Each structure stands twice: as structure tokens, then as C-alpha cells.
Amino acid sequence: MKKIVFTGGGTVGHVTLNLLLMPKFIEDGWEVHYIGDKRGIEHQEILKSGLDVTFHSIATGKLRRYFSWQNMLDVFKVGWGIVQSLFIMLRLRPQTLFSKGGFVSVPPVIAARVSGVPVFIHESDLSMGLANKIAYKFATKMYSTFEQASSLSKVEHVGAVTKVSDQKNPEPDELVDIQSHFNHKLPTVLFVGGSAGARVFNQLVTDHKKELTERYNIINLTGDSSLNELSQNLFRVDYVTDLYQPLMELADIVVTRGGANTIFELLAIAKLHVIVPLGREASRGDQIENAAYFVKKGYAEDLQESDLTLDSLEEKLSHLLSHKEDYQAKMKASKELKSLADFYQLLKKDLS
């Protein structure tokens, strides 16, 4: 039986594509393994998926671009993670390793290359993260969501592979209950803060609940169960799975962070959106770059977190609603998306 090892983690964005691909390989008779951190979100997501995947936990350390005494300890963690991954590779002898990035992916990628296992990696953002910059040196091939510099000879631009589609599905019963609390004469605004929610969105909704619910139906994916609420014109919930796409479809506008997975999901269903990217003080600036790219393409509006107020947000919402057809036409004309089926066929072809 052919074997494939997946890796990637730290955030849901570094796991999502793996979760989409693994069932395809299982259906085709592959034995699927995953290398990650048992305390990480990758392990949680695989357990929730119920997929027939063997999980191997390794030591992992954070890769920092700045000086920290923790770097010294984490160098040893990464080194031990490489040794652990090497033993896993030599024991399994897989046909390939597929990496979605994140700090946990570096040891398996290095170990795979050392043991002669072909390495395929995927980069979602406009600029490569530190983990994938390291992984690229050991990779057989990299697939990218955005076009990359021509000097990166191992990169193939494939566009975004998303978990949502423009196909309409039956409404879940829970959605009917949510809609019964909404005023259908008002536009619906969905706040999405990534897998852990976004405190800045949660605070905005909390501080301006009265004003917001007078003018909009508000859906707030919070990442915090203590904020859960279903009341007049308001639905706040910590986490959703099956409701994710139905809520996307219900919304007239989405207010989101600038993670590539989410904004390309919005592009896939031509949904109006305002991007509030994580600032450089909290990230390497990849979300700022992603947001600027989408604004330049005419897909979205952006708003820096430091400028986020009720007034500034409402100005963006009003602009999008009044120019709805223009934004949707540009999104529908985009050629930057790839179906899961097409990407899977491309990957299988490259593996052969």
C-alpha cells in the first residue's frame, strides 16, 4: 500500500488543505500519516474529522525572526523534532510528504529530504512564511496561491484551493432558527476572526451592540464560548463547522482578518468583504500584503486595525453595499481559484 505523510499546523490555516486532501488519498487506497504536535490544533482537527489517519507527535519549537532567549531552547526542540521525524520516515518509507507550513512542518520536511522522500509544500500567502522559506530549500516542488518571483524555480502557481463553493446547499435547521431572530429588511454582517476569533471584532460588537443591531443583523464568530448569544438581530458563537458556509452565504458582507484561506473562500462565493489585517506588531505583515492585493484587484475594501471604529467600518460597509455589482463582477471574473478535484489530480500527477 502506498503511504503519504502530511504535516502542517499551528493554526487552522495550516491544516485546512490537508483536511481536504487526506480523504481523497484514503479513498484512493493510500495509507495516510500525519506528523505534528499532539498539543496543536492539527491534532484537534484530525480527531474531529474522524479520518483514518495515524498521527505522530514530535517536539516542535517556534522559529522567531527576533532575538529571544527562548530561541536557544527551541533550537534543541527543532533538532529533536528532526531526529524524531527521521525515525518516522525510515520506519514508514512513505512515497511522499505534503506540507502546508507552520513551525511544526520544518522538522518533517528536513527529515523527508534527508531520507530521500520527495517533499511537496504549499504556500497560501503573497510572501512566504519563515517555515516555508526554510522548507523551500528542501522541497521537490512548491505550489503557491499567489504568483511568486520567477527566480523561485521550484514554484508552480496554482491559485487558491478552497473548502467552499458557489453550489447552494439545503439550509440547516439551526440556520432557520438564527434567521428567525433577524430582521430581513436589514443587511447581515458576519465578523470572522480566523480559527481563534478576533478580540478586536468581539470588542467592537460588545461596545456597539445597540447601534450595530439597530442597523444590521450581526453574526460574530468569536472563538470565545462565554460570548455565545442568540437574540434580536444578533448571533454570537465561538466556533462552527457545518454552519460555516451557510453563515457565509447568509451574510451580505463579511468583516474578516486577512488570512489567505478565508479571503479566497469569500472570493470563491463572490461575497462582499472588508479586510482588517493583523498588523506588523502581531505578525510578519502577510495579512497586510494579502489585503492590499485584494483591494488592488477590486475584490474588497481594507481597514487597518488602528483605524477600526464604528464610523470607519460603517463607511466601508456603505461603500460596498452601494457598489455591490462592481465588486461581485470582479470577483466572479477572477481566475485565481482551483477546485479541490483539479488540485488533487495535479498533485497525484506530480507524485507519479
Swiss-Prot record:
Protein location: Cell membrane
Keywords, sorted A to Z: Cell cycle, Cell division, Cell membrane, Cell shape, Cell wall biogenesis/degradation, Glycosyltransferase, Membrane, Peptidoglycan synthesis, Transferase
Catalytic activity: Mur2Ac(oyl-L-Ala-gamma-D-Glu-L-Lys-D-Ala-D-Ala)-di-trans,octa-cis-undecaprenyl diphosphate + UDP-N-acetyl-alpha-D-glucosamine = beta-D-GlcNAc-(1->4)-Mur2Ac(oyl-L-Ala-gamma-D-Glu-L-Lys-D-Ala-D-Ala)-di-trans,octa-cis-undecaprenyl diphosphate + UDP + H(+)
Enzyme class at the top of the EC tree: transferase
Protein's pathway: Cell wall biogenesis; peptidoglycan biosynthesis
Classification via InterPro entries: GlcNAc_MurG, Glyco_trans_28_C, GlycoTrans_28_N
Pfam families: Glyco_tran_28_C (PF04101), Glyco_transf_28 (PF03033)
Membrane topology category: Peripheral membrane protein
Keyword Cell membrane included in the entry's annotation: yes
Cellular component terms per the entry's GO annotation: plasma membrane
UniProt GO MF annotations: undecaprenyldiphospho-muramoylpentapeptide beta-N-acetylglucosaminyltransferase activity
A GO BP annotation: cell division
Source taxon at top rank: Bacteria
Enzyme Commission code: 2.4.1.227
UniProt-annotated binding residues for UDP-N-acetyl-alpha-D-glucosamine: 195, 287
Residues that span the membrane, as ranges: none
Family of the protein in this entry: Belongs to the glycosyltransferase 28 family. MurG subfamily.
Function: Cell wall formation. Catalyzes the transfer of a GlcNAc subunit on undecaprenyl-pyrophosphoryl-MurNAc-pentapeptide (lipid intermediate I) to form undecaprenyl-pyrophosphoryl-MurNAc-(pentapeptide)GlcNAc (lipid intermediate II).
PANTHER family: UDP-N-ACETYLGLUCOSAMINE--N-ACETYLMURAMYL-(PENTAPEPTIDE) PYROPHOSPHORYL-UNDECAPRENOL N-ACETYLGLUCOSAMINE TRANSFERASE, UDP-N-ACETYLGLUCOSAMINE--N-ACETYLMURAMYL-(PENTAPEPTIDE) PYROPHOSPHORYL-UNDECAPRENOL N-ACETYLGLUCOSAMINE TRANSFERASE 1
The protein, known as: UDP-N-acetylglucosamine--N-acetylmuramyl-(pentapeptide) pyrophosphoryl-undecaprenol N-acetylglucosamine transferase
Species name: Streptococcus pneumoniae (strain Taiwan19F-14)
Gene behind this protein: murG
